[in-house]
């Protein structure tokens, strides 16, 4: 919006597509994946007074986590019980105004959002992918934006990085010449983010070379030849 506002200030012309601008208030918003990142997305969405917050995950959120979201919504928005788990992905996207992707990339999620799954989404819904680009089929997303099936697609991740010049996500748009909110994977370039990365690497190296091996659980991905976390596709 900062870029758009600057363009408006220079041109003085109000673009026609602004007539299709909506708030998140009273909308049904969902997340694919409700782990550490997905849950934080839900926390932030409460402030926009959504009608429902849906999530799709192989396991339920702890009751305490759900209660925290519902209580915040009731306190600030006057309505509780907005959080709901949906067991079938097709059912969730069919009722969502906005779908956000917050799950890891693994064999079961690669190409998950293809033409078939997108066909189950509401006409004019928005799809936001800040997880991994390859979770979506690039050509299918571009076609959905062009046809108007999706009102828009946004993300900071690409299925190929750096994206080739002819990548469909570079130029896709709809009849109003909008619907494309792609950025070039720069969400982690803030000074604060870089400091966190550096500190995390330092902690891991110090733990290893001191032979303490007291790693934080979230820093361990593989242990004893298998995944140490259930975030990469394994359900047991």
From Swiss-Prot:
NAD(+) binds at residues 36-37, 57, 104-108, 130, 156, 185-188. GO terms for molecular function: NAD binding; oxidoreductase activity. It holds the Pfam family 2-Hacid_dh_C. The keyword NAD applies. The keyword DNA damage does not apply. PROSITE patterns: D_2_HYDROXYACID_DH_2, D_2_HYDROXYACID_DH_3. InterPro entries: D-isomer_DH_CS, D-isomer_DH_NAD-bd, NAD(P)-bd_dom_sf. The record marks 132, 185 as: Important for catalytic activity. Keywords: NAD, Oxidoreductase. Belongs to the D-isomer specific 2-hydroxyacid dehydrogenase family. FDH subfamily. This is Truncated formate dehydrogenase 2.
């Amino acid at each position: 919006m900062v870029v758009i506002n600057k363009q408006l200030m220079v041109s003085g012309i109000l673009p026609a597509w602004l007539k299709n601008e909506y708030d998140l208030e009273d909308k049904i918003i969902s997340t694919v994946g409700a782990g550490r990142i997905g849950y934080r997305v839900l926390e932030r969405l409460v402030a926009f007074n959504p009608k429902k917050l849906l999530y799709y995950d192989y396991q339920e959120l702890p009751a305490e986590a759900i209660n925290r979201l519902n209580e915040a919504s009731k306190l600030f928005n006057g309505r509780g019980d907005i959080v709901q788990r949906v067991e079938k992905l097709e059912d969730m996207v069919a009722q969502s105004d906005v779908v956000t992707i917050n799950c890891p990339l693994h064999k079961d999620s690669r190409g998950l959002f293809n033409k078939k799954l997108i066909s189950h989404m509401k006409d004019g819904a928005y799809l936001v992918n800040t997880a991994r680009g390859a979770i979506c089929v690039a050509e299918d997303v571009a076609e959905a934006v062009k046809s108007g099936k999706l009102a828009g697609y946004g993300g900071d991740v690409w299925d190929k990085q750096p994206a080739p010049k002819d990548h469909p996500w570079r130029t896709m748009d709809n009849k109003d010449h909008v619907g494309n909110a792609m950025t070039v994977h720069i969400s982690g370039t803030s000074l604060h983010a870089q400091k966190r990365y550096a500190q995390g690497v330092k902690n891991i190296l110090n733990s290893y070379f001191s032979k303490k091996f007291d790693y934080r659980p979230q820093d361990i991905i593989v242990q004893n030849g298998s995944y140490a976390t259930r975030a990469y596709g394994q359900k047991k």
